[in-house]
């Protein structure tokens, strides 16, 4: 594939390495739990869920990581301060090292989570998701005062989905922000900015999404990733077509997994792969591409950080 001329930063959080040259480190897989209408959740406001089922899902991911050598992170989604605190409390109780994203559609919930992580001493594992053009001052203030030092920085430009638009939102601002998102992150005390390219739907910027992966890595030298599976889930034609088929999931899943592999081969350092229930499909596929990236890295003179545990060694 390729090697970047610009030095590529590597951020290590909870033993997980984000970034580097393609193939230098295994691709990080980010599962999502407690998302909207997640079957294991019985009360989204209070954060009541089936703990046994949640732990089974999590242990499956741990086992697949052990088998493949791929690192993992958990994205914890909550819609109220009460629920996200409960989810975080559960997660840090069963796993004392793995980093996790704190995520919500509401800024006050993300702020409450950052504050809670600081209070209970796990802010060094927390990744704020995200710093974006719609962030409000109240969230900025709480994040600045917290001990959280890592954040997803979202390259979503509401008025310009092109590669240039993504660069602009990161560097100069827009969509109501007078500063670039990377500058906002710096002022919040973020030492480890991890860029999310903001995956766009097919026909509305999906090409620019993939092209932005090597472009942004080449320009900023920072870890790059995104929720590429959203390109498949937002595909109107596929949504309609799969309903006409006897096995809709069999039609859908190859496209869901495929979006991640396209981005991975383009240099994406991490993949927000969506529901943790898809863990069995995503790990072997991503490991396969990591073998290709590892082989190429060797040919290009890139030193693989942990060769023994990289899929290129572990699975061949």
From Swiss-Prot:
Coiled coil: none annotated. SUPFAM superfamilies: Dihydropteroate synthetase-like (SSF51717). It is an enzyme of class 7 (translocase). The keyword Lyase does not apply. HAMAP family: MtrH (MF_01501). NCBIfam families: mtrH. Part of a complex that catalyzes the formation of methyl-coenzyme M and tetrahydromethanopterin from coenzyme M and methyl-tetrahydromethanopterin. This is an energy-conserving, sodium-ion translocating step. MtrH catalyzes the transfer of the methyl group from methyl-tetrahydromethanopterin to the corrinoid prosthetic group of MtrA. This is Tetrahydromethanopterin S-methyltransferase subunit H. It comes from Methanosarcina mazei (strain ATCC BAA-159 / DSM 3647 / Goe1 / Go1 / JCM 11833 / OCM 88) (Methanosarcina frisia). The lineage of its organism: Archaea, Methanobacteriati, Methanobacteriota, Stenosarchaea group, Methanomicrobia.
């Amino acid at each position: 594939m390729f090697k970047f001329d610009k030095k590529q930063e590597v951020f290590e959080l909870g033993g997980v390495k984000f970034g580097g040259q393609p193939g230098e480190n295994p691709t990080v897989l980010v599962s999502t739990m407690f998302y909207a209408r997640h079957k294991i959740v019985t009360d989204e406001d209070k954060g009541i869920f089936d703990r046994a089922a949640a732990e089974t899902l999590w242990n499956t991911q741990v086992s697949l990581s052990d088998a493949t050598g791929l690192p993992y992170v958990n994205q914890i989604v909550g819609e109220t301060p009460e629920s996200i605190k409960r989810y975080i409390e559960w997660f840090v109780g069963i796993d004392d090292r793995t980093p996790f994203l704190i995520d919500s559609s509401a800024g006050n919930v993300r702020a409450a989570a950052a504050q809670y992580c600081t209070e209970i001493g796990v802010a060094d594992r927390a990744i704020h998701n995200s710093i974006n053009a719609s962030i409000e001052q109240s969230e900025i203030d709480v994040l600045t005062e917290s001990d959280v030092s890592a954040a997803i920085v979202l390259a979503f430009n509401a008025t310009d989905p092109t590669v240039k638009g993504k660069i602009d939102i990161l560097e100069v601002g827009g969509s109501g922000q007078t500063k670039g998102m990377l500058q906002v992150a710096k002022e919040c005390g973020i030492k480890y900015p991890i860029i999310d390219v903001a995956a766009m739907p097919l026909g509305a910027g999906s090409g620019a999404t993939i092209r932005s992966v090597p472009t942004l890595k080449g320009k900023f030298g920072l870890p790059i990733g995104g929720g590429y599976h959203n390109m498949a889930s937002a595909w109107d034609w596929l949504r309609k077509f799969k309903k006409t088929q006897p096995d809709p999931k069999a039609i859908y899943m190859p496209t869901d997994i495929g979006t991640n592999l396209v981005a991975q081969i383009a240099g994406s350092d991490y993949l927000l792969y969506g529901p943790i229930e898809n863990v069995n499909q995503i790990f072997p596929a991503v490991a396969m591409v990591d073998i290709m990236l590892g082989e190429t890295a060797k040919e290009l003179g890139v030193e693989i950080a942990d060769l023994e545990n990289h899929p290129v060694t572990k699975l061949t």
